[in-house]
Amino acid sequence: MRVIAGSAKGIRLGRAPAGVRPVADRVREGFFSSIGARIEGARVLDLYAGTGAVGIEALSRGAEHTTFVDSAPSAVAAVRDNLRRTRLDDRAVVRRSDVRRFLERGRVDPSGFDLVFLDPPYDAGPPELDPVLALLDVKPLLRDGFTVALSRGTRSSNGVIPLHWLVARRLSYGDSVVTLFRSRSLPRTPGSMEV
């Protein structure tokens, strides 16, 4: 696993800890190609960060800042190690926390995020993910023009799409699907979701 483009291009990232499924190079490459120049100067939130490969790729490609969140101590250590390897740690914050708890009570960046990438375990279903997506929708975390990207296995069950989001694009790579969500212009009622 390596950084694909940008200031840290070609730097090898450390091995994924046991139980962590890193986002494949081709998935990252396709995802970043699809969002293009919007990564320049973006504030990024990498949820279920694993090795940090997605957030590090964002930093390497010109993102202003990335916040990494994962609950596993081994994943947090891997993210920190990979940030040191790439010398991008001065533009990053790493938090060890359950994702839902982080969104409910964590020290979330008050300036908001332009891009949120979620790569939960493939076995995480709607009971875990729907509340996370709802929190992203109702809390003032997302900047105007945001993109939320959800990486799932092709056999993973689908959840509920927050009412204020629309599916902008689906990218398929073997056994992985990345769904890109964007803002839909609707009045906001806390907790509103679309089935």
Q: What are these regions, as identified by a protein language model?
A:
Residues 1-195:
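Class I S-adenosyl-L-methionine-dependent methyltransferase catalytic core
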